[in-house]
């Protein structure tokens, strides 16, 4: 019963706010993700990365999510603003496209442009692009995107 209640709330929330994707940062199982996706929701499943071994069990989510998000492992869910060793991305051999998160800042474009993983689909920009929690600095984002496109 609890699962159905959470599933129903997720659908209503996504519909009410016209969300294109839902990003999951918890301990959701592949089955739970599959059930959410079966309702028509598109999912980004976040994985905490601290070492190469952290990529080993990600494959069980391949069929239940639309994208993966690789973020720095930390105590709390949702990110720390710190960067993990991005050279470890070479350990990811899956076919699911992923977004990179964790420690990306306005000065990251030169380093990000050097990343050549075939499944890298984009970047998750958060706290370092905000003037206050939840409010993006449009000028900072514009500058970042210009630098990334150079």
Predicted regions and their residues:
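Short, small-residue-biased leader/transition segments that mark boundaries at the very start
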Residues: 1-7
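Short beta-strand elements of ligand-binding domains
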Residues: 4, 23-25, 45-46, 100
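Catalytic cores of alpha/beta
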Residues: 8-20, 24, 30-33, 50-65, ...
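Short, acidic/turn-prone active-site loops that include or flank metal/cofactor-
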Residues: 26, 48-52, 73-75, 126-134
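C-terminal helical cap(s) of enzyme catalytic domains, especially alpha/beta-barrels
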Residues: 36, 113, 126, 130-150
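Short beta-strand/loop segments at the ligand-binding rim of alpha/beta enzyme cores
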Residues: 37-50, 94-101
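Active-site rim beta-loop-alpha module in soluble metabolic enzymes
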Residues: 72-84
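Short Gly/Pro-enriched loop/turn and capping motifs at secondary-structure junctions
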Residues: 74-75, 97, 104-109, 130
């Amino acid at each position: 019963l609890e699962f159905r209640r959470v599933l129903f709330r997720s659908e209503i929330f996504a519909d009410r706010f016209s969300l294109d994707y839902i990003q999951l940062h918890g301990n959701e199982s592949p089955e739970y993700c599959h059930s959410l996706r079966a309702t028509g929701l598109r999912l980004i499943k976040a994985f905490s990365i601290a070492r190469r071994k952290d990529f080993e069990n990600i494959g069980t989510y391949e069929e239940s999510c639309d994208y993966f998000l690789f973020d720095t492992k930390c105590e709390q869910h949702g990110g720390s603003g710190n960067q993990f060793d991005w050279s470890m991305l070479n350990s990811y051999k899956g076919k699911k496209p992923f977004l990179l998160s964790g420690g990306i800042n306005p000065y990251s474009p030169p380093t990000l442009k050097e990343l050549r993983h075939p499944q890298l689909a984009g970047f998750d920009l958060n706290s370092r692009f905000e003037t206050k929690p939840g409010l993006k600095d449009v000028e900072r984002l514009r500058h970042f995107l210009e630098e990334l496109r150079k």
